[in-house]
């Protein structure tokens, strides 16, 4: 039983590379991981894959929380922040708590991801077309490769 717990703990640590990130650049890259995961989560919601939506959201949330903690602890150089963090995300990192900031980031990432899905010209797309467009965007963005596998 003890061996199984130790093995599980070791596998968990090895499967969580972001928790061991120590360089400024690695922390900054987490902002891009969070943004991409939030975009992909929004797309998965459109084609009704709730497990994938949740997996991506939780990964984005974890990466975002780690990124914000590192940013607040001044562990990220300005150079890395400028080169790795999505510019819009950088504008949204204000607010009373990290969760509030991540809520703003999620909303903006969702809007960016769904812009080509929800409307064509000035009219709303029907549900079946939205699902198809969301699936196409999801595949084009290689969303399945983001975060730990299902």
Task: Name every feature range the model reports, one short phrase each.
Residues 37, 53-63:
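Alpha-helical solenoid repeat scaffolds, predominantly canonical TPR units
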Residues 1-2:
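N-terminal secretory signal peptides that target proteins for export/translocation
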Residues 46-55, 69-73:
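Short, solvent-exposed secondary-structure capping/transition elements
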């Amino acid at each position: 039983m003890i061996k199984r717990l130790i093995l599980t703990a070791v596998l968990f640590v090895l499967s969580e590379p972001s928790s061991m990130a120590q360089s400024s650049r690695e922390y900054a890259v987490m902002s891009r991981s969070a943004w991409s995961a939030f975009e992909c989560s929004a797309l998965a919601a459109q084609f009704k894959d709730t497990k994938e939506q949740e997996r991506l959201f939780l990964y984005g949330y974890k990466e975002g929380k780690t990124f914000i903690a590192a940013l607040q602890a001044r562990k990220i150089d300005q150079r890395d922040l400028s080169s790795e963090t999505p510019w819009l995300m950088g504008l949204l990192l204000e607010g009373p708590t990290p969760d509030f900031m991540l809520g703003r980031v999620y909303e903006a990432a969702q809007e960016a991801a769904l812009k080509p899905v929800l409307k064509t010209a000035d009219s709303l797309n029907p549900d079946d077309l939205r699902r198809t467009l969301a699936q196409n965007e999801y595949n084009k963005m290689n969303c399945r490769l983001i975060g730990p596998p299902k």
